[in-house]
């Protein structure tokens, strides 16, 4: 039996929790718990409140997810 496909959502980090966990508010205003993927952790990428991130959620548990990408904020031109 094949695994069901994971779903990707865009969201904003609302709160930083201990042990590399975060509260992320998705585009549809649902707040979920998310942890950092291994590649982000391995490369010491910092995630702060307000960062835009991509979250992968399993269809089996829609309350938890995994942060797979942090969007780079555009710098304002002067």
Curated annotation (Swiss-Prot):
Protein localization: Cytoplasm
Boundaries of every S1-like domain copy: 1-72
Gene this protein is translated from: infA
Main location: cytoplasm
Subunit structure comment from the entry: Component of the 30S ribosomal translation pre-initiation complex which assembles on the 30S ribosome in the order IF-2 and IF-3, IF-1 and N-formylmethionyl-tRNA(fMet); mRNA recruitment can occur at any time during PIC assembly.
Pfam families for this protein: eIF-1a (PF01176)
GO cellular component, as recorded: cytosol
HAMAP family in UniProt: IF_1
Biological source species: Mesoplasma florum (strain ATCC 33453 / NBRC 100688 / NCTC 11704 / L1) (Acholeplasma florum)
Protein name: Translation initiation factor IF-1
Similarity comment: Belongs to the IF-1 family.
Protein's job: One of the essential components for the initiation of protein synthesis. Stabilizes the binding of IF-2 and IF-3 on the 30S subunit to which N-formylmethionyl-tRNA(fMet) subsequently binds. Helps modulate mRNA selection, yielding the 30S pre-initiation complex (PIC). Upon addition of the 50S ribosomal subunit IF-1, IF-2 and IF-3 are released leaving the mature 70S translation initiation complex.
């Amino acid at each position: 039996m094949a695994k069901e496909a994971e779903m990707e959502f865009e969201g904003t980090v609302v709160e930083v929790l201990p042990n590399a966990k975060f509260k992320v508010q998705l585009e549809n205003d649902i707040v979920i718990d998310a942890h950092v993927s291994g590649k982000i952790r391995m490369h010491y990428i910092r995630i702060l409140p307000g960062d835009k991130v991509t979250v992968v959620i399993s269809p089996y548990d829609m309350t938890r997810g995994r942060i797979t990408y942090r969007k780079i904020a555009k710098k304002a031109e002067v």
